[in-house]
Design a protein with these regions (language model features):
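A general secondary-structure boundary signal
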Residues: 117, 149-150, 155, 169, ...
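Short, locally clustered residues in the helix-turn-helix/winged-helix DNA-binding domain
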Residues: 140-144, 157, 177
Length: 206
C-alpha cells in the first residue's frame, strides 16, 4: 500500500461525515469488496456443479483410503481383503452417509453464498442509488477492480485529482453505512447486519 493509500485509510477511519452505527462495517465491506466478488463467483460455481454421489464414486473413494485393519473384522489379505472392506462399508450405509454429508455441505455453501451475495448487494445498491457517476466509477475501479489511486487518476477520462479520488471513496463508505442502517431498520435484515459485525470483529482480532 502506497503513501496515498495509507493516508486514505486514515481519512476513511477518522474523517467521514456519516454519523451512524455502521461506519466501521461499511469500511470493512469497502475494503473487502473485490474479495467478496471473487468469493461469490467461486461459491456460485460450486453450487452449480454436480453434487451427485453414486456407489461407483464411493468405491473409487474407498479404494484410495489407506486400510486400517485395527477395527476390521476381515481376516483375509490382498485384493480379497480390500474388496471385503469396501463391501462392508457399502453395506454399512457408507453411500448414504456421504450423501447426507454432501447435502449438509451444499446447504452450508448455499447459506454462505446468500450471505456473501447480500454483502455485495449492500455495496452495489449503495453506490448505484447514492453516488454520482464519477464517484461510483472511482469506487468500483479502486475497491472492486483493485486499481491504485494513481492508476485511476491517470486513466480517468478528463482527468481527476487525488483529492477527488479520496473524496469519492469517503462518500462511498458513507453511502454503504447509510444503506446498512436502512436495511437494519427498515428491511428486517438485522440477522445479516449482526453477522457482518461479528465477522468484522473476528477479522480485526485475528
Amino acid at each position: 500500500m502506497g503513501r496515498k493509500e495509507m493516508n486514505m485509510e486514515k481519512e476513511l477511519q477518522s474523517g467521514s461525515t456519516a454519523i451512524n452505527s455502521f461506519q466501521d462495517e461499511a469500511l470493512f465491506l469497502a475494503n473487502h469488496y473485490g474479495d467478496m466478488l471473487r468469493i461469490r463467483d467461486a461459491l456460485k460455481k460450486r453450487l452449480e456443479g454436480s453434487w451427485e454421489y453414486t456407489e461407483d464414486m464411493a468405491i473409487d473413494e474407498l479404494v484410495t483410503i489407506t486400510p486400517n485393519y485395527s477395527g476390521d473384522h476381515v481376516q483375509s489379505s490382498g485384493i480379497s481383503n480390500t474388496t471385503a472392506r469396501i463391501t462392508d462399508k457399502l453395506m454399512d450405509g457408507y453411500v448414504e452417509r456421504r450423501r447426507s454429508q454432501m447435502e449438509k455441505e451444499r446447504e452450508a455453501c448455499r447459506k454462505e453464498y446468500e450471505y456473501v451475495d447480500w454483502k455485495v448487494s449492500v455495496i452495489t445498491t449503495a453506490v448505484r442509488e447514492r453516488l454520482d457517476k464519477k464517484s461510483r466509477t472511482i469506487f468500483l475501479k479502486n475497491r472492486g477492480e483493485g486499481r491504485s489511486y494513481t492508476e485511476i487518476q491517470e486513466k480517468t477520462k478528463g482527468g481527476v485529482s487525488s483529492k477527488t479520488v479520496r473524496q469519492a471513496i469517503v462518500v462511498a463508505v458513507d453511502a454503504i453505512a447509510d444503506e446498512l442502517q436502512w436495511r437494519f431498520v427498515m428491511c428486517e435484515e438485522r440477522e445479516q447486519c449482526y453477522r457482518l459485525r461479528n465477522e468484522m470483529r473476528g477479522w480485526n482480532n485475528s
